[in-house]
């Protein structure tokens, strides 16, 4: 982690997001109704989904902190992928309703220009949500938390949608009343796309997709550079919530005693944990190299 307090931020960030989302939901909803902006009202529903998403994220972080037990011997880390999928689903469902309502409004021709105050309100929410995105994406990346990263993108989608609302309202005020409704359609398409991306990433995590090739190459290099390691004949890695797990099978000098072989394996494990961020569970299987092989010391 970059800073010592990154772990503390992990415990605080979602509460800040939860509070900000509640304020933004009420602010945009009330201002949208008062100003007559259908896009801003729709955007407030998006923020309402953010409130639920922040609550789900907070719950998943609490559960993922639980230690491994007999029922879940690999820990509770994958609950964060479920949280990410729920957030993505909420965005997708909300976008679908918003798209439907906006298209019906566009076809029927029942639209009128909202007040310019809607644009001012949207500009405030753009700033707040972008700040929350930057805060959460920093904390999420430093803690390798898919749940916090998903929540960050939820706020980024809210910032972008509010920006679209602002443009639509301004265009409506200067003589294009249809622009507010078109902005709502654009917002719904964007939010739906982000929702699908979050769901896709969650599915990859739950299906134990491999870590990046670069990370595997780093682990491979660390292991082969460790003294008395002859070769690596199997290596795989996966994400489990915030942690990275590796399964490594290596060969050592056949003349080594069992105790010494274990010490070599422990050296590999320690180096990987020290040099690869979030590497928590390193599973090693050691076997002797062919007797004729000369091993580097």
Curated annotation (Swiss-Prot):
Keywords: Biomineralization, Cell inner membrane, Cell membrane, Ion transport, Iron, Iron transport, Magnetosome, Membrane, Metal-binding, Transmembrane, Transmembrane helix, Transport. Residues 1-12, 105-112, 186-297 are cytoplasmic. Residues 1-214 are annotated as: Transmembrane domain (TMD). Residues 34-83, 134-164 are lumenal. Induction: Part of the probable 17 gene mamAB operon. InterPro entries: Cation_efflux (IPR002524), Cation_efflux_CTD (IPR027470), Cation_efflux_CTD_sf (IPR036837), Cation_efflux_TMD_sf (IPR027469), CDF_Transporter (IPR050291), Magnetosome_CDF_Transporter (IPR053436). The keyword Iron applies. One of its GO terms (cellular component) is magnetosome membrane. SUPFAM superfamilies: Cation efflux protein cytoplasmic domain-like, Cation efflux protein transmembrane domain-like. Belongs to the cation diffusion facilitator (CDF) transporter (TC 2.A.4) family. The C-terminal domain (CTD) is probably responsible for hetero- and homodimerization and binds 1 Fe cation per subunit. The CTD assumes a V-shaped, dimeric metallo-chaperone-like fold. PANTHER family: MITOCHONDRIAL METAL TRANSPORTER 1-RELATED. This bacteria makes up to 60 cubo-octahedral magnetosomes of about 45 nm in diameter which contain membrane-bound crystals of magnetite (Fe(3)O(4)). Expression of just the minimal mamAB gene cluster (MGMSRv2__2365 to MGMSRv2__2381), including this gene, is sufficient to form a minimal magnetosome chain with small magnetite particles. This is Magnetosome protein MamB. It comes from Magnetospirillum gryphiswaldense (strain DSM 6361 / JCM 21280 / NBRC 15271 / MSR-1). The lineage of its organism: Bacteria, Pseudomonadati, Pseudomonadota, Alphaproteobacteria, Rhodospirillales.
